[in-house]
Curated annotation (Swiss-Prot):
It comes from the Bacteria. One of its GO terms (molecular function) is S-adenosylmethionine:tRNA ribosyltransferase-isomerase activity. This is S-adenosylmethionine:tRNA ribosyltransferase-isomerase. InterPro entries: QueA, QueA_dom1, QueA_dom2, QueA_sf. Its EC number is 2.4.99.17. Pathway: tRNA modification; tRNA-queuosine biosynthesis. Its main location: cytoplasm. It comes from Citrifermentans bemidjiense (strain ATCC BAA-1014 / DSM 16622 / JCM 12645 / Bem) (Geobacter bemidjiensis).
Length: 341
């Protein structure tokens, strides 16, 4: 398969630069995987898409203010962008570093509050960095860092982003990008879904900067997928087993939830625990866990667009995207949503 197979035309004015007036005010495009039928609804009415006995799986990651500004001990300015936490080491991160000169192993960066960062080594295309000097690193980060926004949002972060670029169920700090399908959901919508006889559980996948990185090869067999840290609780794995046994659907809220579940089921059944997902889902992939997907619209030629093409069929998905463009749906992180069932 080739990168050019997953391209589509998108007028730039359809890329949402701000969130909708309310979380549940977005539009919803529906796609039936079996018939290819396309419909339209609203996020406010999304509970109607669920059936009694379904299981909804959320990603409860919380976006952190991942952009930090400090200086070398010699005085030069340094910007560090946290990409992902190193598994098992809460204050060691893979980072992007912007400075006048490329950093060297052992270089120390000083930040407000007495925190220092030591550059340890290269970690693929990133740097592995150890932060020291804070009793509560995440609390310090909340005070010191700035909120990241996706590169296709062509404006500076504003006050509304602190609330709206975060899901209402965000809990586990560690993402540098939001699981955007969840941005539409309100407590009232979740209550309405529960009222239809649907169980709701969570996973944690800390969305990394790699979600925005373009694929740089035409032959997709040559692409190396980025890694993201995730955790499946025991109760979530058990709920999935119960749902499958009774014939219910597992509905993933967002591609991040889907990637965590499918990676955790590599041996057949979803296994609880903490791992790193590097799963690259292309058409032809056999889905083991997820039966329905709620997702936003994804960038052309992106790994996430390839994922939804694998889930619904490439031609059906391309047709759905053409329909979304013709109906002037809003695209990407602050855009509208899809329910693929």
């Amino acid at each position: 398969m080739f990168l050019s197979d997953f391209d589509y035309e998108l007028p730039p004015e359809l890329i949402a630069q701000h969130p909708a007036s309310r979380r549940d005010a977005s539009r919803l495009l529906t796609l039936d995987r079996l018939s290819g039928a396309i419909g339209e609804a609203t996020v406010a009415s999304i509970a109607a898409q669920f059936l009694p006995g379904d299981l909804l799986v959320l990603n409860d990651t919380r976006v952190i203010p991942a952009r930090l500004h400090g200086h070398k001990e010699s005085g030069g300015a340094v910007e560090i962008f946290l990409v992902r936490r190193v598994a098992g080491e809460p204050e060691c991160w893979s980072c992007l570093i912007k400075a006048s000169k490329s950093p060297k192993n052992g270089c120390r960066v000083v930040f407000p509050g007495g925190v220092t960062a030591t550059v340890l080594e290269r970690d693929g295309g990133d740097w592995r960095v150890l932060f020291e000097g804070s009793d509560d690193f995440m609390a310090w980060l909340e005070q010191t860092g700035s909120m990241p926004l996706p590169p296709y949002i062509k404006r500076a972060p504003e006050g509304e982003d602190l609330e709206r670029y975060q899901t209402v169920f965000a809990r586990e700090k560690g993402a540098v990008a939001a699981p955007t399908a969840g941005l539409h959901f309100t407590p009232a919508i979740l209550d309405e879904i529960r009222g239809r006889g649907v169980e709701i559980v969570s996973v944690t996948l800390h969305v990394g900067l790699g979600t925005f990185m373009p694929i740089r090869v035409e032959d997709l067999s040559e692409h190396t997928m980025h890694r993201e840290l995730y955790r499946i609780p025991q109760e979530t794995a058990a709920a999935i087993r119960r749902t499958k046994e009774r014939g219910g659907r597992v509905v993933a809220l967002g591609t991040t939830s889907l990637r965590a579940l499918e990676h955790a089921a590599a041996s057949g059944e979803v296994a609880a625990g903490e791992r790193e997902a590097d799963i690259f889902i292309l058409p032809g992939y056999r889905f083991r866990v997820v039966d329905a997907l709620i997702t936003n619209f994804h960038l052309p030629k992106s790994t996430l667009f390839m994922l939804v093409c694998a889930f619904a069929g490439k031609e059906a998905m391309l047709e759905a995207y053409r329909e979304a463009v013709s109906r002037r749906f809003r695209f990407f992180s602050y855009g509208d949503a899809m329910f693929i069932g």
